[in-house]
């Protein structure tokens, strides 16, 4: 009789855990027990509860790091320390630079066991995640005056370098407006010389203004030399073409 009762109790227990609902409840219990995933807080050295991470990469419980920042800020009022520091690496930390970690799409509301009492401190709610529309958790430039000064100095250096580059670009004759005008003038003069050489009329040019380059020629020896070289080159080209034409007439 006792053996039959034991078998029925074992069968009932097995069927209870074998159902999907029983498995789901057991899995939820395991998840709630291991919500921290095995990571420990660097202050209380216990399984992390409401985890937050600093910009320097250290993991803390939100109540622990809030108390730490609170006591550091209170003690800094009576000393020269300006901002609370990380307990591990002594980097500057604040509530704005803490990044909350929300696992499995929610927040654990189960109170942590073994935590120190609040000591009269009202711990606010953990900051919202940036992904959920919270405020951006990067440190502002106003909190660090030295970085702000370095940034401004870099901007001033970049602004002083930019006109130098622009001056080097403008010094190029091809990019400056004056250089472009001079190049256009040279090409127009060479074109007029070629037009006059081919058609044998030095008084009529390809433009509506005859002798439009006489002033430039008379005022610039360099222009005179370039035009004379162009004239000789055109003469040689015309003579070569004439010889080719005569040769073609003789042979064909």
UniProtKB/Swiss-Prot annotation:
Question: Reported effect of changing residue 89 to S?
Answer: Strong reduction of ubiquitin ligase activity
In alphabetical order, the GO MF annotations are: ubiquitin protein ligase activity; ubiquitin-protein transferase activity; zinc ion binding
- What is this entry's stated membrane topology? Single-pass type IV membrane protein
Q: What is the effect of changing residue 115 to R?
A: No effect on ubiquitin ligase activity
Subcellular location per the Swiss-Prot or TrEMBL entry? Endoplasmic reticulum membrane
Q: In which pathway does it act?
A: Protein modification; protein ubiquitination
Q: Which UniProt keywords apply?
A: Endoplasmic reticulum, Membrane, Metal-binding, Transferase, Transmembrane, Transmembrane helix, Ubl conjugation pathway, Zinc, Zinc-finger
ZnF bounds (RING-type)? 41-90
Q: So where does this one cross the membrane?
A: 232-251
Q: Show the Pfam families listed in the entry.
A: zf-C3HC4
What GO terms fall under cellular component here?
endoplasmic reticulum membrane
- Which SMART domains does this UniProt record tie to the protein? RING
Record's compositionally biased regions (Polar residues): 140-162
Q: Name one GO biological process term.
A: response to wounding
Q: Where is this region: Disordered?
A: 102-162
Asked whether the UniProt record includes DNA repair among its keywords, one would answer: no
Q: Which domain of life is it from?
A: Eukaryota
Which reaction is this enzyme known to catalyze?
Answer: S-ubiquitinyl-[E2 ubiquitin-conjugating enzyme]-L-cysteine + [acceptor protein]-L-lysine = [E2 ubiquitin-conjugating enzyme]-L-cysteine + N(6)-ubiquitinyl-[acceptor protein]-L-lysine
Inducing factors: By drought, cold, high salt, wounding and ethylene. Not induced by abscisic acid.
Which principal EC class is assigned to this enzyme? transferase
The record's note on its domains = The RING-type zinc finger domain is required for E3 ligase activity.
Q: Quaternary form?
A: Interacts with Arabidopsis PIP2-1.
Q: Which PANTHER family would you find in this protein's record?
A: E3 UBIQUITIN-PROTEIN LIGASE RNF5-RELATED
Instruction: Give a short account of what the protein does.
Output: E3 ubiquitin-protein ligase required for aquaporin levels regulation.
Name it: E3 ubiquitin-protein ligase RMA1H1
Q: Which gene encodes it?
A: RMA1H1
């Amino acid at each position: 009789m006792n053996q039959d009762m034991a078998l029925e109790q074992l069968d009932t227990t097995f069927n209870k855990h074998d159902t999907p609902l029983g498995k789901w409840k057991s899995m939820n219990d395991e998840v709630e027990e291991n919500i921290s995933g095995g990571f420990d807080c660097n202050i209380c050295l216990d399984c992390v509860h409401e985890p937050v991470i600093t910009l320097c990469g250290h993991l803390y419980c939100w109540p622990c790091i809030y108390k730490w920042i609170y006591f550091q800020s209170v003690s800094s009022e009576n000393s020269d320390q300006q901002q609370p520091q990380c307990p591990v690496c002594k980097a500057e930390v604040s509530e704005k630079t803490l990044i909350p970690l929300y696992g499995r799409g929610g927040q654990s509301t189960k109170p942590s066991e073994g935590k120190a009492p609040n000591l009269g401190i009202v711990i606010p709610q953990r900051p919202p995640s940036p992904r959920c529309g919270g405020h951006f958790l990067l440190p502002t430039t106003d909190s660090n005056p030295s970085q702000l000064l370095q940034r401004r100095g870099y901007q001033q250096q970049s602004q002083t370098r930019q006109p130098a580059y622009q001056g080097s670009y403008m010094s190029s004759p091809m990019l400056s407006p004056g250089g472009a005008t001079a190049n256009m003038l040279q090409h127009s003069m060479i074109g007029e010389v070629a037009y006059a050489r081919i058609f044998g009329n030095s008084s009529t040019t390809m433009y509506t203004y005859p002798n439009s380059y006489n002033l430039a020629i008379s005022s610039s020896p360099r222009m005179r030399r370039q035009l004379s070289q162009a004239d000789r080159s055109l003469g040689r080209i015309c003579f070569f073409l004439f010889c080719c034409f005569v040769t073609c007439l003789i042979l064909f």
